Each structure stands twice: as C-alpha cells, then as structure tokens.
A protein has these predicted regions:
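Conserved N-terminal phosphate-binding loop of PLP-dependent enzymes in the Aspartate aminotransferase
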Residues: 1-376
Length: 376
C-alpha cells in the first residue's frame, strides 16, 4: 500500500482512470504554447480555483517552490507599488518547509537544507512556531507579510490553534501586511476540505498550491486577491512551462473528481477511522509510539524509536510511509483510500511494533510495490 502518495501528490491514487483519460485526450491535441497565449482550459481552471477560494487571480507554474517564489514576489511587489519598497521582509516559522530554491530555502531557514549553498538570502525573519509574541516582536517597518503553513508537513505534521491563525490575520490587518498560506501540501483536499484555510476560518491574501493539484502531473499555482496582486503587471513575473495544456488538463480532471458531492466527506470519514485505529496502536505500544497528530489525511505518528527505522520496517511489510521532522512518520494515504486499506495499513503498523526495529529484511529486485491502483 502506498501511503506516501508521492509525498501528498497522488491524491487520487496511481493512474486514476479519469486523469489518464484527460491526459491521453490532451496529448493528441496540444502540449505546449508558452504563457504568451491564453487557453480556454487554462481560463477554466483559473476560474474554478477562484470560485472555490478567496482569490481573484491565479498564476500557474510547475512546482510548489515556484508557487512560493511567486507568492514572495507578489508580497514584495505589492508594497513597492504602494511606494514602500523598503517593506520586503517576511516573518516565517521554525520547522517550516517552503521549497529548495534559494528564496524558499531562506524562507524555510533550516540549516540542513542550507548547508553548502552559502549565506541565505536576506529578507526572512524566523520565529518559533505558534509563538504570537515572537511574531509581534518580529514585525517592523520593513515587514511585508507573514508566511505560514496551515499544518507543517515536513516539520512533523505540526499545527497551531485556530486562535493563533486568527491572531495572525488580525496582525496583518492592523499593520498593513499580507498573509500568505503555503498550501502546497495541505491544499487540494489533504486536510479534509479543498483548502485548509477553510477549516481554519481564516482567509489569507495569497496562497500557494502544487502537489495534488495535478494528481501526479507537475503543476503549481499562486492565488491572490485583486488587492494583493495589484502590484503585478504584465512582465513582472513569468514561466515558460507554467500552465502548459497537459498540466492544465490534469488539474481540471483532479477538480472534476474532488468537487463531486461527498468527496470531502469521505476524506474526513477515512481520516477519523485512520486516526482512531492508529491511536489504539499507540496506546498499546508506548515504548515505540507516542502520539497521533494531523488533519484530514495528513496524519503523523510520533515515534519513540528512530522514525527511519519504523519507515524501513513498514516498507518491508509492503506499506510505504514517509518520515518528517520531530521523529514523525507520515501516513499520507490517497484521498480515495477505503476502509479495508486503512485497516490493512494499521495492521501492518501493529505487526512491526511487536518486533525489534533497526534492521530491514533483504529486498529483492523482483519485489513489486503494491499501490492503490494495482502493482507497479
């Protein structure tokens, strides 16, 4: 069972028939035309994303890092256009992950990702996650925006109280700042709604998407209100491959499936079942596991033993999971997972916790990885 989903990308499993059909059809029509020209399908995707969110404008790109770079540029350009180019700094949070470009690495602020790449780019002030007083102290005359993930994925599936996010919104309103949500991992249904901000009841000014947006085909998007995007003019940003017809076809197909009635109810139902079952395993093996955390099907199990050993042992049982910070193992099931697959995954976890960890069984080149859409 693949409970990595390509790190929260394959939200509809592997080779979902509707996505396959959409890509096959588009591949016979048009592959690439650059962003010099508009396309009806691209306009439709942008309109659908705006209709389902707070946004008025969408910029298409190819990845989460590119979507985040766009978000950073939009925030800085907004203040420059208002006559305040000195307002370019962003408040970010410890444990965050925003990408691997130089700009997003600086926003991430993690030493292990920055090692060997020289000094980080200027313009980011990192504070402890969930510390409102630290945020207030970090805001100054050069601050442009606050950037945060609704749930930290790479950082260990860590969230913060809803009141904290509401306070961030108020701080932005009081100080003329923009609020940016990095929903690259939390967006597109992963937390039980199309976007995590809806469950928080806190609306950002800018939001980045990627990962599950294309269901496995590379695409990213930066969404913004008309006010936040007011500094962006033709030529101020661009992407050769962003919004190419194949990626647009995949993303529209993903929305076709996700916007059907009952889809997110199913995600929430499977989330509750998975977390309840995982919690029972945690209760039985406190020397191995200590906590279940997360929202929707962005679920983490905090380990007492090294999380890497647990990931390896689960892989030997033919369950694919992925590690995260804070010694957490992420269970990122496809959003179409069923009850039997949830039960099977938890049974596999139960089995590995009963034996010594740290040594993987020999693996053979003929082994197949079982996925939610058959074997690879």
């Amino acid at each position: 069972l693949d409970f990595t989903s390509g790190v929260a990308v394959n939200a509809l499993g592997h080779c979902h028939p509707h996505l396959v059909a959409a890509l096959q059809e588009q591949a016979t029509r048009l592959w690439h035309m650059s962003n010099l020209f508009k396309s009806p399908d691209g306009d439709r995707l942008a309109a659908r994303l705006c209709e389902q969110s707070f946004a008025d404008f969408v910029f298409f790109c190819n990845s989460g890092a590119e979507a985040m770079e766009c978000a950073i540029k939009v925030a800085r350009r907004y203040h420059a256009a208002k006559g305040h180019p000195e307002r370019y700094r962003l408040v970010t949070f410890e444990g965050a992950f925003h990408g691997r470009t130089l700009g997003t690495l600086a926003a991430t602020g993690s030493a292990k990702y920055l090692e060997g790449f020289g000094p980080p780019l200027d313009g980011f002030d990192q504070v402890p996650h969930g510390d409102l007083e630290a945020v207030k102290k970090a805001i100054g005359p050069q601050t442009a925006a606050i950037l945060i993930e609704p749930v930290q994925g790479e950082g260990g599936v860590r969230s913060a109280p809803t009141a904290f996010f509401k306070s961030l919104r108020q701080l932005c309103d009081d100080n003329g700042l923009l609020l940016i949500f990095d929903e690259v991992q939390t967006g597109m249904g992963r937390t039980g709604d199309l976007f995590a901000y809806k469950r928080l009841g806190v609306t950002p000014d800018i939001m980045s998407l990627a990962k599950a947006l294309g269901g496995g085909f590379p695409i990213g998007a930066c969404l913004a209100t008309a006010e936040a995007a007011s500094g962006m003019t033709p030529g101020s940003h661009g992407s050769t491959f962003g919004g190419n017809p194949l990626a647009i076809a995949a993303a529209n197909a993903v929305l076709d499936v996700m916007l059907k009635p009952g889809f997110f109810d199913h995600v929430q139902k499977m989330s509750l079942l998975l977390k309840q079952k995982l919690a029972s395993v945690v209760d039985r093996y406190p020397a191995v596991l200590s906590e279940v955390r997360g929202e929707g099907l962005l679920v983490g199990v905090k380990a007492v033993v090294p999380s890497g050993d647990l990931v390896n042992a689960l892989r030997d049982e033919k369950l694919l999971t992925v590690g995260a910070g804070d010694n957490v193992v992420r269970f990122l099931a496809p959003l179409i997972v069923n009850e039997a697959e949830v039960e099977q995954s938890v049974q596999m976890l139960d089995e590995v916790t009963t034996r010594p960890l740290g040594r993987s069984r020999p693996r053979h080149s003929s082994a197949k990885a079982c996925t939610l859409a058959g074997s690879l």
